[in-house]
Amino acid sequence: MSFEVFEKLEAKVQQAIDTITLLQMEIEELKEKNRSLSQEIQNATSGRESLAHENEQLKQEQQVWQERLRALLGKMEDVQ
């Protein structure tokens, strides 16, 4: 009788070990996915900052061109 109890206990312990091993593997997979997503977020943030800087430069260029165009139109009106 005690041998049967020991076998059942051994089976339960082995099942617990298997479950723990699977959970550890899942944790490692989730950690890797988390690292990957963190890198993607960092890249996206960097890209956003770059685009914001480029946008600001383009706005400044547009402002310069608008001022030049206004000056040119003013000269054309003076000629007429």
Curated annotation (Swiss-Prot):
InterPro entries: Cell_div_ZapB (IPR009252). The keyword Coiled coil applies. One of its GO terms (cellular component) is cytoplasm. It is found in: Cytoplasm. One of its GO terms (biological process) is FtsZ-dependent cytokinesis. Gene3D superfamilies: 1.20.5.340. It comes from the Bacteria. The keyword Metal-binding does not apply. It holds the Pfam family ZapB. Signal peptide: none annotated. Residues 3-80 form a coiled coil. Keywords: Cell cycle, Cell division, Coiled coil, Cytoplasm, Septation. Belongs to the ZapB family. Non-essential, abundant cell division factor that is required for proper Z-ring formation. It is recruited early to the divisome by direct interaction with FtsZ, stimulating Z-ring assembly and thereby promoting cell division earlier in the cell cycle. Its recruitment to the Z-ring requires functional FtsA or ZipA. Homodimer. The ends of the coiled-coil dimer bind to each other, forming polymers. Interacts with FtsZ. HAMAP family: ZapB (MF_01196). This is Cell division protein ZapB. It comes from Photorhabdus laumondii subsp. laumondii (strain DSM 15139 / CIP 105565 / TT01) (Photorhabdus luminescens subsp. laumondii). The lineage of its organism: Bacteria, Pseudomonadati, Pseudomonadota, Gammaproteobacteria, Enterobacterales. The gene is zapB.
